[in-house]
Every structure is written in structure tokens, then in C-alpha cells.
Regions:
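HhH-family (HhH-GPD) DNA N-glycosylase catalytic core used in base-excision repair
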Residues: 9, 17, 21-25, 29-332
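Extreme N-terminal basic, low-complexity initiation segments
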Residues: 2-14
Length: 332
């Protein structure tokens, strides 16, 4: 196994990680692999309840993800929940009624607490933190939902890796084409973040909050966006962007708090809370593509008001978020 470290012009380390040798076992970890280069590997599993298809989730095309093919592995590289100061890479593969995770991390082996945090984070990202069978039954009870759901019964919402990364995406991608946002995220991650080789493919991870604060410029990003990224990093360091904390708050309360961050308005605060914290039943309004898909699916010949949309969504409880995402992704 090799770990290649190069210095950017700002003096930040860029980490590129590839494969391995020597096995070590830990109490809550299996197949841990360590080398003197400082890269550690381990494995973990997540149970699958209800219909679930990792391909549908990996290919959703959400945020920075823009996969054009699926080889059976969903590759994820992110800042670990908590203080977001540790990079990890995960290659996830569905095997029957479980998700197998091959994990790579830099530095010391992940502690038992960190392994559990990682499992919880991945479960949230691929929506395995909820009872998929209950969602399946709700969809079958509504002829309109059933027709759409059965196009891809294993589909579930793909989420941002964390509120921290959703906030970064909000700043980077605002008022520009999604493809441009993907390019800028990749550029920043390559220079100041980390890159893990996951099942033969290099996968980039955004900078940690401390590294983000060291950035003075990124080609293509205006100076005011850099200042906004610094504000996101500082918020993460204060615990404002903790996923559990935000997820425990009422969505509207969390959104109001996030709007105190420069560059985060109503739309992006909703994106962070609903699409990064794991809410399954937060009502979604003010999202034109979802609303258009809902109107088409139900044969509604006029533009729904927010009140009408909320009234219709009452029948989807406790899965209003999942239904809205499913409508947008599959209705066409």
C-alpha cells in the first residue's frame, strides 16, 4: 500500500491513497489493514430492511454525484461525522440483505466509536436508517404512488454526506450550472482535500474545516465565496452543522438557524436540513421540479399552491420527504 502526499502552493497536504497488506483485528472492527504509510483499512456491514437497490441510489445524480455507469460499487469519500476533521473512503456493495463496506482512513485505525459513527453516516446517506418496508407498504396503498414506486421499488433518496458538505455544495454551486459546481468541488478537493482509491477508482473528498480555513483562493470561485466557505468551516467547528443536532431540531427551526450563515437563504437551508440530516417526513415546498412531477403524476391541471401541496402530502405521512424525492426522480 502506498500513500502519496504532495504539497499544494498553499502548503496543504493532498492525500492519495491506494491499496494494502498486513492484517490486524480490533474489537469492533474486522479485517483491519495497516501500513507504515499511515493508511488503514477495515470492513463493516449495514442491514437492509425492505426493498433496496444500491444501483438506483448510486445513479440518482444528486449534488456532486454524477455517475454514468454502475459496476456494483458505490464509492463515497467524506469527512467523518463529529468534528469533520477526519477523511474516510468507503466502497459499498450490496450483498443480499446487507450492505458491505470496505473502509479506508488516514492515520490511526478508526476507533470503535468512529466505526459506529461511520456506519451511521453511511446508513443516513443511502437511507438505510429508516424502515424501507414501511415506505414500500405506504406506496402500495396509493395507486399513484404504487405506479411510480414499482418503476424502481428499491429506490431510496441519496443524501449529502453531511450538513457540512451540503453547506459547502450550496456555496460552491449557487447561481451556476450543476456541472460547473461539480468541477469546482473537484478542483478544491484535489488541491486541499483527499483522494482515496476505492475499488480501482480515485474518489475525491472535500477539505476538512481546518483545511478549508487555510484556503485563500480557488480558481473559478469569487472572493466572496471563499469568505462564505470560511464561515461554513467555522460553523462546523462550533458544532452548528452537527448532523444529530440539526436532525433533532424541527426542520423549520434548523433552517432558520442555518440562514444566519452568509450565502445560505431559504432554498439552501432547506436543502441542507432535508437532504443531509436524514429527515423522512419533512414536507417539501418551493421545489419546482418536485412540484411539477407531483402535479403530472396526480393529473392536476393547475399549479399547486403551497397549501394544496401540503394538504395532498398529508396522505404520505410519515414519508413526505421520501415521496417527494421519489416523484422528482422517477415520475418522468
Amino acid at each position: 500500500m502506498r500513500e502519496h502526499l504532495t504539497k499544494s502552493s498553499r502548503g496543504c497536504e493532498r492525500r492519495y491513497c491506494s491499496s494494502s497488506s498486513q492484517n490486524v483485528r480490533g474489537a469492533a472492527q474486522t479485517d483491519v489493514v495497516m501500513t507504515t504509510s499511515g493508511l488503514t483499512s477495515t470492513t463493516a456491514e449495514l442491514p437492509v430492511v425492505g426493498p433496496f437497490d444500491l444501483r438506483d441510489i448510486a445513479m440518482m445524480g444528486f449534488g456532486h454525484r454524477d455517475e454514468r455507469s454502475f459496476d456494483g460499487v458505490m464509492r463515497m469519500a467524506f469527512c467523518l461525522d463529529g468534528d469533520y476533521e477526519r477523511h474516510v473512503g468507503v466502497a459499498a456493495q450490496q450483498v443480499g440483505d446487507r450492505l458491505e463496506l470496505k473502509v479506508k482512513s488516514l492515520g490511526d485505525p478508526l476507533s470503535d466509536t468512529e466505526v459506529e459513527a461511520l456506519r451511521k453516516q453511511v446508513a443516513r446517506v443511502v437511507s438505510l436508517d429508516h424502515d424501507g418496508e414501511a415506505f414500500h407498504q405506504l406506496c402500495l396503498s396509493d395507486p399513484v404512488l404504487a405506479r411510480i414506486h414499482m418503476k424502481a421499488p428499491g429506490f431510496r433518496p441519496a443524501l449529502f454526506y453531511s450538513p457540512y458538505e451540503a453547506a459547502l455544495w450550496s456555496i460552491i454551486s449557487a447561481r451556476r450550472a450543476r456541472s460547473q459546481g461539480i468541477t469546482l468541488r473537484g478542483r478544491m478537493s484535489e488541491l486541499y482535500g483527499a483522494s482515496f482509491e476505492l475499488s480501482g477508482t480515485a474518489t475525491l473528498c472535500v477539505p476538512t474545516p481546518s483545511a478549508l480555513l487555510e484556503i485563500e483562493s480557488v480558481s473559478g470561485l469569487p472572493a466572496d465565496r471563499i469568505l462564505r466557505l470560511h464561515a461554513v468551516a467555522q460553523a462546523a467547528q462550533r458544532g452548528v452543522l452537527d448532523a444529530d443536532r440539526l436532525g433533532a431540531m424541527a426542520p423549520e427551526e434548523a433552517q432558520a438557524e442555518l440562514q444566519q450563515l452568509p450565502g445560505i437563504g431559504p432554498f439552501y437551508s432547506s436543502l441542507i436540513v432535508i437532504r443531509a440530516c436524514g429527515h423522512a417526513d419533512a414536507p417539501t415546498v418551493g421545489e419546482p421540479r418536485s412540484q411539477a412531477a407531483i402535479q403530472q403524476a396526480y393529473g392536476i391541471d393547475h399549479e399547486l399552491s403551497d397549501a394544496e401541496l401540503l394538504a395532498l402530502a398529508e396522505t404520505w405521512r410519515p414519508w413526505r420527504t421520501w415521496v417527494s424525492v421519489m416523484m422528482r426522480a422517477l415520475a418522468a
